[in-house]
Amino acid sequence: MSVFTEHRAAPFRRAAGGVLLLGLLLARSVAGQSAEELQLLAWVDDHRGEAVDLLEQITNINSYTLNPDGVREVARVLAPHFDALGFETRWIDGSAFERSGHLFAERRGTGPRMLLIGHLDTVFPEDDPFDTFRLVDDTTVAGPGVGDMKGGLVIILQALQALHAQQLLDDANITVALIGDEERSGSPRELARRDLVEAARWADVALGFEGLETATSAAIARRGATGWTLTTRGIRGHSSRIFDDEIGYGAIFEAARILNSFREEFAAEAFLTFSPGLLLGGSEISRDEISSSGTASGLSNVVAESVVATGDLRTISREQGQRVIARMTEIAEDHLPGTSATLEFRGIPEGMPPKPGSERLFELYDETSQDLGFGPVDLIDPMRLGGADISTAAPYVDGALAAIGGMGAGWHSPDETADLKKITIRTKLAATFILRLMRTQWSQGSD
């Protein structure tokens, strides 16, 4: 049994062979459910109360991304549960990228190498009045992060517990990566996601347990996201002289030109969105990056000297992100007279475009859902999804399947809820899907 102590991660084993190809499924019951699978379903039903208790416990821990003690406390609650299943847990310190850190749990065997991805943090600050788990009705619970994604954490853990209870983890080859800064990535991002990338290089497939606010569905493509900051400068002067050769156009017109040019250039491009979320402009401005707030002052008869705008950029692939960032930078550098501008990005968005291995994972997941009587699984349009850490892992694995966590409504708001019935269904589906995936033949490259 491992101890939850803080240390740096040892390097993951990296496959030296080529792309791993999903092979034919081993023979199983034509009836749809094997005796082992029926035992998994019964175990999940018998332990629904424990699932709700754990969900309440971790929801009542404030794990806002910038609350390192809270993020770490959620990890401390979860780690012993993984230890009890024969996983080796380790805490990866995040001080180098200005965040709390990540919890990884690993169990090595001979089966396909699976990477299960979730996150520990939420968007709700410590002083947010929405701070307590509560029952809304027999099937609905509310609380900060109950849907995104503490319900998903319970699904991951209980699916593995169900498999362990039937002694079905003996050949498991699984890494669970629970990220501590998914909602607001640390910097530099390359360091913040280094261990996840190394885990993805080791893995054959990646499964993302963030959920959705919709019916039973999953995704084989989702967009990556990054943040940007636009800063413009102008020459302060009396407004009667705006546009002349000495004063020029001012910082606000320069910012407006750039943002509107972005809209004109990119609004119609497939799988691409960019959104300014904060804009401050005037004679003097002050911005607090931690609270995402600021102040601005100016007079109607004075040409604005300063503007800062922040927002996000979402693309379906790294290649699309690189191209768009290059063009946005060109636009920002084509200044109006008397102005200057800088445009900074937090990194290149790591999108998750569809690939054949992901399509095969979806087919197996959909087949499993129908075999269990849960009906077909909808394939989600990536435009309906935000960024997630599985997009960082996806380029390195043969197949990736996302959005297989819990369901609810009002996520990232004081109305956030989770559907307990859907958590049970998704747990049964996850446990059975992982079992079937463990028994899938793979064409392995040499290590």
Language-model-detected regions and their locations in the chain:
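Acidic/His- and Gly-rich active-site-bordering loop/insert found
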Residues: 33-144, 164-170
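Short, flexible, mixed-charge acidic loops at enzyme active sites
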Residues: 125-135, 221-225, 289-294
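Acidic/histidine-rich catalytic neighborhood of metal-dependent amide-processing enzymes
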Residues: 149-225, 281-291, 442-445
